[in-house]
């Protein structure tokens, strides 16, 4: 696991992860209120859409979309979702067709999702510090290899490689 000491380190990690993302990836962000899920998503969106992109939290409308030249980013916040079926009213089937999906508070629909999934877990340690882990159930090792090769965090990476479909990346 990686301790992110401040927002700058969180930005760096989000941008690093964004470099490995591609259409059809689904990223689940977990953590308590104020853990930094939306902040993390904003940095991923900025990577694809530009630093000056006006990024609005989907907390009240549950969904915000952002167009890139090749695909759309669907940013969901499911905190207020009452039932799993409501996700389909938010264009989820369309989102699954060649787009990047970011989901905050995904627990309510996780059973509907099929691999590969990338989970980013953020835990508040204090006002500025977060504990972060990334888990993927992808059979491909491209994400693991990419993060492991990064000069930004490579000295802190402890990658668990096993034959199970779930691979935990402890930063």
UniProtKB/Swiss-Prot annotation:
One of its GO terms (biological process) is tRNA threonylcarbamoyladenosine modification. GO terms for molecular function: ATP binding; metal ion binding. Keywords: ATP-binding, Cytoplasm, Magnesium, Metal-binding, Nucleotide-binding, tRNA processing. It is found in: Cytoplasm. The gene is tsaE. Belongs to the TsaE family. InterPro entries: P-loop_NTPase, T6A_TsaE. Mg(2+) binds at residues 38, 104. Pfam families: TsaE (PF02367). GO terms for cellular component: cytoplasm. This is tRNA threonylcarbamoyladenosine biosynthesis protein TsaE. Required for the formation of a threonylcarbamoyl group on adenosine at position 37 (t(6)A37) in tRNAs that read codons beginning with adenine. Is involved in the transfer of the threonylcarbamoyl moiety of threonylcarbamoyl-AMP (TC-AMP) to the N6 group of A37, together with TsaD and TsaB. TsaE seems to play an indirect role in the t(6)A biosynthesis pathway, possibly in regulating the core enzymatic function of TsaD. ATP binds at residues 7, 34-39, 127.
């Amino acid at each position: 696991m990686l301790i992110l000491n401040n927002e700058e380190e969180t930005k760096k990690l989000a941008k690093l992860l964004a470099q490995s993302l591609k259409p059809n990836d689904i990223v689940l962000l977990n953590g308590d209120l104020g853990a930094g899920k939306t902040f993390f998503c904003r940095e991923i969106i900025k990577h694809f859409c530009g630093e000056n992109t006006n990024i609005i939290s989907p907390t009240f409308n549950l969904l915000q979309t952002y167009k890139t030249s090749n695909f759309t980013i669907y940013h969901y916040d499911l905190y207020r979702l009452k039932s799993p079926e409501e996700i389909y009213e938010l264009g989820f089937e369309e989102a699954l067709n060649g787009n990047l999906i970011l989901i905050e508070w995904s627990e309510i629909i996780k059973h509907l999702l099929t691999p590969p999934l990338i989970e980013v877990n953020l835990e508040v340690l204090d006002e500025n510090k977060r504990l972060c882990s990334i888990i993927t159930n992808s059979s491909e090792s491209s994400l693991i290899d990419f993060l492991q090769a990064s000069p930004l965090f490579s000295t802190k990476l402890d990658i668990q490689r096993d034959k199970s479909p779930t691979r935990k990346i402890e930063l």
